[in-house]
UniProtKB/Swiss-Prot annotation:
Classification lineage: Eukaryota, Viridiplantae, Streptophyta, Embryophyta, Tracheophyta
Keywords, comma-separated and alphabetical: Chloroplast, Membrane, Photosynthesis, Plastid, Thylakoid, Transmembrane, Transmembrane helix
Domain of life, per lineage: Eukaryota
Gene field: ycf4
Transmembrane parts of this sequence: 22-42, 57-77, 101-121
Annotated protein name in UniProt: Photosystem I assembly protein Ycf4
Organism of origin: Gnetum parvifolium (Small-leaved jointfir)
Length: 185
C-alpha cells in the first residue's frame, strides 16, 4: 500500500507488527504461563490446572524446572511484545520529486526511538534492481535502489513476502516514477 502523486511517493515499511509475530508472542506467553502455573501448583500441592494432574508432580526437581521454563518464557515473550509495541524496523520510504530527494526513514531500533534519515539526490539514482534467490524451501525477493557512490539501498525487505509478479509490478511503478531502468535478477 503506497501513496502516489505526481511528485510524491510514500511507501510504508512494515516493522515487527506482523501476524506471525503476534501469533508466536501469544503462543509463547500462553506456554510460559502454563509452565509457571503447573510449577507453582506443584509447589503448593494443589491442582490449579484441572485437566492436568499437576498436584502429582514433585516440586523438586520437576516443579522447579517448570517454573524456570515459565519464567524464561515470560522474559522471551515480553521481549517479543516490546518489539511489537515499539514496531522495531518500521518506517517509510519517501521520494519527493519537487525537492529531488529520496528519503528513507526508520523509526525505532533496539527499543530506542531513533530518527534515521538517508537523503539521496534523485539525479544520483541509477536503476531499480531486483534480486531473486529461490531454493527448495525458501525464496528471497529483494528490491534495491542503485545509487551512484553508495551501496544498494533495500526498498522492500525479505519479510514483506512478495511474489515475483508483485515485485515486478512494484519495481515497474517505481522505475516509471523515477524515470530509471530496471535491473533484474
Amino acid at each position: 500500500m503506497n501513496h502516489q502523486a505526481k511528485r510524491l511517493w510514500i511507501e510504508p515499511i512494515k516493522g515487527s507488527r506482523r501476524k506471525s509475530n503476534f501469533f508466536f508472542a501469544s503462543i509463547i506467553l500462553g506456554g510460559a504461563l502454563g509452565f509457571l502455573l503447573v510449577g507453582f501448583s506443584s509447589y503448593i500441592g494443589r491442582n490449579l490446572v484441572p485437566p492436568l494432574l499437576s498436584h502429582q508432580i514433585l516440586f523438586v526437581p520437576q516443579g522447579i524446572v517448570m517454573c524456570f521454563y515459565g519464567i524464561a518464557g515470560l522474559f522471551f515473550s515480553s521481549y517479543l511484545w516490546c518489539t511489537i509495541l515499539f514496531n522495531v524496523g518500521g518506517g517509510y520510504n519517501k521520494i519527493m520529486k519537487k525537492k529531488e530527494f529520496y528519503v528513507f526513514f526508520a523509526g525505532v531500533s533496539q527499543g530506542k526511538i531513533v530518527v534515521f534519515f538517508l537523503r539521496v539526490p534523485l539525479k544520483n539514482v541509477q536503476t531499480i534492481k531486483m534480486e531473486v534467490q529461490e531454493s527448495l524451501f525458501y525464496s528471497r525477493h529483494v528490491l534495491y535502489m542503485k545509487v551512484k557512490g553508495l551501496p544498494d539501498i533495500p526498498l522492500a525487505r525479505t519479510g514483506d513476502h512478495f511474489n515475483l509478479s508483485e515485485m515486478e509490478q512494484k519495481a515497474a511503478e517505481l522505475a516509471h516514477f523515477l524515470r530509471v531502468s530496471i535491473e533484474g535478477f
